[in-house]
Amino acid sequence: MIRSFVLASIIAVIAAIAHAEEPIVGNWKTAAGDTAVIASCGGSYCVTLKTGKYAGRKIGTLAGTGGSYAGEITDPAAEKTYSGAGKVSGNSLRMQGCVMKVLCKSQTWTRL
C-alpha cells in the first residue's frame, strides 16, 4: 500500500515537471495595448500578435530558459527585424530590440 502511494506520488511529480511551461509562455499586453501570445514552437518560443492592427502576425522568435530569452523581434509597423531579448520577472516581461547590439529600445509587457 505504501509502495503504491510512493509510486503514484513520484509519477505525479514527474508529470508536473514534464508539463511545466517556461515563464514566458502565455498572453501578454504590449506597450501599445495589443495582446501578444507567446507559445512553444519547435525548440523556441514564437511571439504572435493576437489583437490590434497586426493581429495574427508573428513578430518574434525567442529561445532560452528560466526567465531569460534571446532571439529576433520584428517591428510590424516598420517591417524591420532586430536582435531581441526578453526577461520575465513575475508578471512583467521586459522586451528589448537592438540594432548591432548598440542602439537598443525596450518596453515592458504585462501578463494577462
Residue ranges and their predicted role:
Residues 4-14:
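Sec-dependent N-terminal signal peptides
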Residues 22-85:
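Central antiparallel beta-sheet cores of small beta-barrel/beta-sandwich binding domains
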Residues 85-108:
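Short, exposed beta-strand-loop hairpins at the edges of beta-sheets
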Residues 9-11, 67, 77, 81, ...:
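Long, low-complexity, intrinsically disordered polar/charged segments
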Residues 18, 36, 45, 93, ...:
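A broad, low-specificity signal marking well-ordered, structured residues that form hydrophobic/aromatic
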Residues 111-112:
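Short, solvent-exposed mixed-charge patches
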Residues 14-21:
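Sec/Tat signal peptide C-region and signal peptidase I cleavage site
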